């Protein structure tokens, strides 16, 4: 398509001097950078973004109710946002996942990681021959039909299931959606394989898309620390860390979660891998409360895995989240035997690695223990971070030796 045959998109005009982030190819335009919208645009509709003098900068999606007024689809003026566009993006992303899946023997991985794969607001996880779709932005929802058509072209043998039932959609004025899109319904529990483990995934009712693929490498790394050790697995969900700890030869692993359904699946995962169920304990409880009870009763562990849900959704919550992370890590440090290992994580995008490391250091001081940082973690390689969007590095973690 030549430029002369392009549709005339509405134009989002930026205030003077507010184009710098787009010139650096950051994919978001915040409300404070906007001067005006020329023309009419529906929620999620494609718009052109220009500087205060009318110079073209990018093409994106309009979201008037969000602090992120526009999310960029492309920095190429000659690129139209259509089925062919989504097909190109999918095939580009698949090249890396094909190599990774073959290299690591994976049957499940993140196929599309939003902005880092050039598709802002789009998350797609692949579990076997099921594609699980999450559309998190107005632009992604507006392009639903084109995206699904591209998926059917690229993956004709895969079923597509929608898990766009996340609260963040409400911020952009969208309803929550869930259900089959094409093909068969996923089974209640779908078995996948990960580094020698067999794990059951609840696509329809589980957290997010059903399973935390981003922690794959951290689960594998756990095995080097747990041989003949007593392990506490906090916020255990369906037991991926527990199964990995048992495969690493731990003496005992105690998994704690507030969801009985998740703990039941964790138990099934231990059995599915033919591991010694007598070494696995499953506790339904609040982690903060249980850690305090363990401290009062003098319980001790050799390894503690701390993988909490996101504590912070926006900048106004950051200080409170810092206190929460410090308190829970302080409790964990107090429960570790000398020489014990704390594997601790944060999946909050607003929590930088440097800030998280400082929080762990402060927690150690409050616990009256010395801590050595011995290993650093991040999301698995199927969750890439494009250089112009550092916010994409949301998962960070540390292995700490507690003296």
From Swiss-Prot:
Keyword Translocase tagged: no
UniProt KW keywords: Cytoplasm, Methyltransferase, RNA-binding, rRNA processing, S-adenosyl-L-methionine, Transferase
CDD domains per record: AdoMet_MTases, PUA_RlmI, RlmI_M_like
Annotated ranges, domain PUA: 9-88
Catalytic activity: cytidine(1962) in 23S rRNA + S-adenosyl-L-methionine = 5-methylcytidine(1962) in 23S rRNA + S-adenosyl-L-homocysteine + H(+)
GO CC, alphabetical: cytoplasm
PROSITE patterns reported in the protein's UniProt record: PUA (PS50890)
Superkingdom assignment: Bacteria
InterPro entries: PUA, PUA-like_sf, PUA_sf, RLMI, RlmI-like_PUA, SAM-dep_methyl-trfase, SAM-dependent_MTases_sf
Primary localization class, coarse: cytoplasm
Transferase is among the record's keywords: yes
UniProt GO MF annotations: RNA binding; rRNA (cytosine) methyltransferase activity
EC number: 2.1.1.191
Job description of the protein: Specifically methylates the cytosine at position 1962 (m5C1962) of 23S rRNA.
Similarity section: Belongs to the methyltransferase superfamily. RlmI family.
Protein name according to UniProt: Ribosomal RNA large subunit methyltransferase I
Species of provenance: Salmonella choleraesuis (strain SC-B67)
Lineage per the UniProt record: Bacteria, Pseudomonadati, Pseudomonadota, Gammaproteobacteria, Enterobacterales
Chain's gene name: rlmI
């Amino acid at each position: 398509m030549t430029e002369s045959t392009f549709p005339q998109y509405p134009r989002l005009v930026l205030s003077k001097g507010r184009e710098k982030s787009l010139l650096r190819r950051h994919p978001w335009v915040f409300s404070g950078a906007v001067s005006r919208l020329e023309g009419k645009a529906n929620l999620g509709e494609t718009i052109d973004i220009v500087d205060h003098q009318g110079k073209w900068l990018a093409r994106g999606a309009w979201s008037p109710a969000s602090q992120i007024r526009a999310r960029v689809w492309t920095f190429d003026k000659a690129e139209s946002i259509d089925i062919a566009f989504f097909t190109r993006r999918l095939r580009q992303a698949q090249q890396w996942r094909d190599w990774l899946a073959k290299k690591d023997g994976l049957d499940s991985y993140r196929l599309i990681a939003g902005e880092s794969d050039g598709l802002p607001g789009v998350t797609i996880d692949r579990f076997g021959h099921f594609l699980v779709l999450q559309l998190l932005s107005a632009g992604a929802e507006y392009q639903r039909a084109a995206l699904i058509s591209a998926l059917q072209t690229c993956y004709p043998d895969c079923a597509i299931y929608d898990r766009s039932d996340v609260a963040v959609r409400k911020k952009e004025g969208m309803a929550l959606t869930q259900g089959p899109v094409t093909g068969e319904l996923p089974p209640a529990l779908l078995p996948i394989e990960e580094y020698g483990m067999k794990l059951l995934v609840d696509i329809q009712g589980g957290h997010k898309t059903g399973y935390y693929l981003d922690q794959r490498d951290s689960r594998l790394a756990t095995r080097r620390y747990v041989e003949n050790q007593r392990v506490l697995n906090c916020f255990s969900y369906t037991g991926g860390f527990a199964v990995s700890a048992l495969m690493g030869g731990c003496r005992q692993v105690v998994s704690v979660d507030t969801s009985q359904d998740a703990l039941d699946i964790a138990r099934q995962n231990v059995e599915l891998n033919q591991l010694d169920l007598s070494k696995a304990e499953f506790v339904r409880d609040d982690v903060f409360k249980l850690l305090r009870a363990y401290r009062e009763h003098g319980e001790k562990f050799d390894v503690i895995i701390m993988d909490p849900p996101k504590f912070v959704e926006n900048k106004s919550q950051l200080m409170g989240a810092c206190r929460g992370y410090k308190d829970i890590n302080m409790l964990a440090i107090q429960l570790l035997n000398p020489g014990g290992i704390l594997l601790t994580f944060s999946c909050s995008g607003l929590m930088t690695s440097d800030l998280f490391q400082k929080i762990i250091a402060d927690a150690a001081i409050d616990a009256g223990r010395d801590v050595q940082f011995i290993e650093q973690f991040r999301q698995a390689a199927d969750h890439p971070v494009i250089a112009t969007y550092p916010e994409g590095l949301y998962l960070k973690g540390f292995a700490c030796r507690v003296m």
